[in-house]
Amino acid sequence: MYRTADKLLEQLKKLIRREFNRLGIIGFDELNAFRVTKETTDLFIRLMAENMKRYLLAAKNANANAKALAIAAGFVDREIPVPDEAWVRAFLASYNFVSGYLYEQEAERKRLRLAEQIMTAKEYQSRTQYNDSLRRAANLWWSQTLHYMLDTVDSATLEAYELMGVKKVEWHTHMDGKECKVCRERHLKVYPIGDVPPKPHRNCRCRLMPVPIKK
């Protein structure tokens, strides 16, 4: 279910590292409030654009996979809308109940924090502090990128199921001993398609499978 998403995430992980490393080579003598604002703004515009491209690919793949699973479960094959860029934008603009924030607003908060940390590092002429700030910012952006990638897949999957006529889904937890208590308790529970509980934590990889018509 997340195989394509994981491949796209590997691309994004390398891109994030490259983008923040590029910012790290700027010398202290080149930094001022205007330059820092421009550099960090341009950085996050690029990062969000790259995420958008890959979220769209992941959503389309999830749509196709969900349709195939629904057909395998006995639902009639039919044409259903495929996610487009507008779909991804609308999804990212919605409130996320797991993260507790809005995607773009959180990206701007991360940018502002990074800009402030860079200016503080310059004030103290601390290259170590500068590099640490970039590393923390990269890790935080990676965390947000990962979380929203998995949520994109989940949202596109559920929507495709519903469009295919699926009425109920079954929660499947990967029972490897590392699962959380909530996910363990939800394993194999059946939920109406419109009443599936939010994932209990970030980066949850529990799957939702269509309940066959005969059930």
Question: What residue spans do the PLM features occupy?
Answer:
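N-terminal leader/targeting and assembly helices and adjacent pre-domain segments
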Residues: 1-156, 164-165, 212-215
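Acidic, glycine-rich two-metal-ion catalytic cores of nucleic acid-processing enzymes
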Residues: 132-215
